Amino acid sequence: MTNIRKTHPLMKIVNNAFIDLPTPSNISSWWNFGSLLGICLILQILTGLFLAMHYTSDTMTAFSSVTHICRDVNYGWIIRYMHANGASMFFICLFMHIGRGLYYGSYTFLETWNIGVILLLATMATAFMGYVLPWGQMSFWGATVITNLLSAIPYIGTNLVEWIWGGFSVDKATLTRFFAFHFILPFIITALAMVHLLFLHETGSNNPTGIPSDTDKIPFHPYYTIKDILGAMLLILVLMLLVLFTPDLLGDPDNYTPANPLNTPPHIKPEWYFLFAYAILRSIPNKLGGVLALVLSILILVLVPFLHTSKQRSMMFRPISQCMFWILVADLLTLTWIGGQPVEHPYIIIGQLASIMYFLIILVMMPVASTIENNLLKW
């Protein structure tokens, strides 16, 4: 008798994706982040669902409803902080996952990579709208500042902003629609993640060497299921350390003050995972220029496969490219730090230099480094 997991229409899909999947025998822990992102997504949907049961998307009661969740709902505080810090864990895993893709040349799987970029944009949109929902000071002013950026679009900008707001300022209509979109987007992300996986399984996984591994494959289960469980345990350990010991470490104290349209906080800044893009936005004195740089800082990922000039796929055996990659990582950390600093000397010039470096490394230095390596190897 044939095993049911290989014949049942639904079980067959699961089997081919998670059990009998032929996997390269040498993939490292950097390949764990895909499954960790899946765990983060499930965790966010579950905690978010329970939060939505008690949350009210009205400007008068939103802040109070979050307070009510933390004080009066059974285990409401842990659900709320798991959701808030879960978003941070989600982005840590996302950045690691993208970094892995850049380092090992996984971006040569074009469809998988491009859907990944769409997933990143959808996740960023979801996180932004989620940050608005508690209706604290930073929620309100963050929403005002970021949505206002669309007014930089020539001719239709102002109308577009008012259309998104549902009025002439961020108000009740804005909060209600942000809640609706924040609720629906994770399910769209789930569907996109399935398509992401579908395209990945068409080609099979990449591996650290970047060399095709068709001759050396092992089944996903038990080898990588156990490895993923270890990764998941570490993820949950770090998340729960954050939630139970320093739940507000990554948040902004201003968000414990109810939203007040008449009082602007001294430093408006987004959550830490958007600071690098925020620093790039602020480093350009022109509004439209800043918005374009902000959008390009993410969409530049789409260009990466076309900027690949090396004869090798992975950076494993390319020391000059490795240097460029780690300079890029340092540059992104610098931008993240600058994004959280006030707009004054010397932060302005550091931010501008780091922003120029960011685009220069990806568009010029990395392709040049690859060409130099090709010549050194006489390829």
Swiss-Prot record:
Assembly behavior: The cytochrome bc1 complex contains 11 subunits: 3 respiratory subunits (MT-CYB, CYC1 and UQCRFS1), 2 core proteins (UQCRC1 and UQCRC2) and 6 low-molecular weight proteins (UQCRH/QCR6, UQCRB/QCR7, UQCRQ/QCR8, UQCR10/QCR9, UQCR11/QCR10 and a cleavage product of UQCRFS1). This cytochrome bc1 complex then forms a dimer.
GO cellular component: mitochondrial inner membrane; respiratory chain complex III
Functional description taken from the UniProt entry: Component of the ubiquinol-cytochrome c reductase complex (complex III or cytochrome b-c1 complex) that is part of the mitochondrial respiratory chain. The b-c1 complex mediates electron transfer from ubiquinol to cytochrome c. Contributes to the generation of a proton gradient across the mitochondrial membrane that is then used for ATP synthesis.
Subcellular location: Mitochondrion inner membrane
Molecular function per GO: metal ion binding; ubiquinol-cytochrome-c reductase activity
Entry protein name: Cytochrome b
Entry cofactors: heme b
Membrane topology annotation: Multi-pass membrane protein
Keyword annotations: Electron transport, Heme, Iron, Membrane, Metal-binding, Mitochondrion, Mitochondrion inner membrane, Respiratory chain, Transmembrane, Transmembrane helix, Transport, Ubiquinone
Family: Belongs to the cytochrome b family.
TM stretches of this protein: 33-53, 77-98, 113-133, 178-198, 226-246, 288-308, 320-340, 347-367
Cofactor binding description: Binds 2 heme b groups non-covalently.
Family matches, as Gene3D superfamilies: Cytochrome Bc1 Complex, Chain C
A matching Pfam family: Cytochrom_B_C
Key word Lipoprotein present: no
